[in-house]
Amino acid sequence: MESVAKLLAAGDPVYFTLQNMSEFRNVATRPVPNNGLGFSVALALGEMEKIERFLTILPDSPAVYGEWKRLVVQHSVLGSKVHDAKLVATMNVHGIRRILTFNTEDFTRYDIEAIHPLSLLS
């Protein structure tokens, strides 16, 4: 969250998508022994509402679907990597070129810049 705060303080726009929020809720409400945060429903909702207050949601649209389909075919995307392709499709449709992610290697196949959050803090 420090890296997001740094971007916001610098005046950089920071966005989220339904995909980001659903992945957050999945991890937030998953039990700790199962690699989750173990948040209650109420705590997860509170954190989601904080995100909504500070960041801008990028909407899904038929154009996002078309771009996602193009990407998964062009890059032969398989399995859970289709979720990364959906993020990139949303970015492409909305003209966004950079993504903040701990999994930078998952985005190397795409024509975007993947930035690790820790790189903004050094």
Residue ranges of predicted features:
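Short, well-structured N-terminal submotif of metal-dependent ribonuclease cores
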Residues: 1-16, 31-43, 105, 109, ...
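Short, hydrophobic secondary-structure boundary micro-motifs
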Residues: 17, 37, 57-61
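Active-site neighborhoods of divalent-metal-dependent phosphate/nucleic-acid chemistry enzymes
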Residues: 31, 56-104
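Short acidic, glycine/proline-enriched helix-loop-strand junctions
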Residues: 47-65, 69, 75-76, 107-122
